[in-house]
């Protein structure tokens, strides 16, 4: 396994550009390939040490998320990190709406399969994730699940970091190719 400066060079010069090209090769914006390309077009490698990056990669590689419950636990940790960023005065808080408020909004709107749920300033996509969990709480047919996955949840986000956070949050919740658009809703 490569490490040190060679690993940083590989990530910066080969891996990130390769993943960014997924967007151009994707069949449509509705695919996970397109979303991967968008994500890697928005982010940059923050690691300066290839040794630290190798340690992080080995730690992540040891994690196993086989069940839906384990994946949900990862998404909860992810949202907690976003929340803490905001509480520490960093910009993560502007993308995070407290979960109890989101749950109340979903309970009041009570979305059903076949309806569309839209968040025009989705930030971390917490509202869309909660709506997804609400809709998944019932037994769904294969057709209903396909509708939920591809034709129910929509969002827009203007800021690049929030857009990437929202995409990742939806993927961690189980939405294979989130219908988020990186755009200004009011423009």
Please report, for each region that a protein language model flagged, where it lies by residue.
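Non-catalytic, mostly N-terminal accessory regions of nucleic-acid modification and defense proteins
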Residues: 1-113, 179-187
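Conserved S-adenosyl-L-methionine
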Residues: 92-187
